[in-house]
Amino acid sequence: MIVAIDGPAGSGKSTIGKEIARQLGFNKLDTGAMYRAVTFAALDRGIDLDDEAAIDALAEQIEIRFTNGTGEDTRLTIDGQDASAAIRTPQVDANVSKVSAYPGVRAAMLIHQRRAAEDRDIVAEGRDIGTVVFPNAQVKVFLTADPRERARRRVLQRHQNDAQPLTAEQLEAEVDETLDALKQRDKLDSSREVAPLVPAEDAVHVDSTAHTIDEVVSIIEDLINQRR
């Protein structure tokens, strides 16, 4: 079975998808992390992000793998090096929409994504899972949330391993800054020519703003159980 969870940045896709996969014993595929990996690799190697041919070539060359770390964490490596934290920086946030819009990059990632789902139960999350990657997925969910709540979640995710927690003032200031970036990314993701961020016609819409993680997981697991 394939469960497709699409939605904008900060809607809770990664957290929800990870928990569903854990509870049901499914494999988890974070396609957004793959595009972040290409973006980080390009920035790290000093490749001009406007050089589409160079970015396309990079996407074909690098080896992106997901491996289990301690506990339930899934680690992402690029050519054998752990990049799990490096792909979640503001610099990557600001540039991943540009990189992921390149048709060559999407084509390279699509091959890996479909291969990962062969002969296994999988929870895949991203922006075009139900429309492009797995259009025949048995369960399709389009997950949304209030933009400011999404920005708050993204900031908390970014600082979850900090030794010193953010003050209330620091949190609100960073949320304001992140909200502007999220709105810009929403615009870019929704308007790109290749695989834009749009819900599949047969997707179930779930607004996670006022729900806990467990509540959203329960809603989606009910859908899965109905279609098994």
Question: How does the language model describe each region?
Answer:
Residues 16:
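Hydrophobic positions on the alpha1 helix immediately C-terminal to the Walker A/P-loop
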Residues 84-160:
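ATP-dependent NMP and nucleoside kinases share a basic, alpha-helical "lid"
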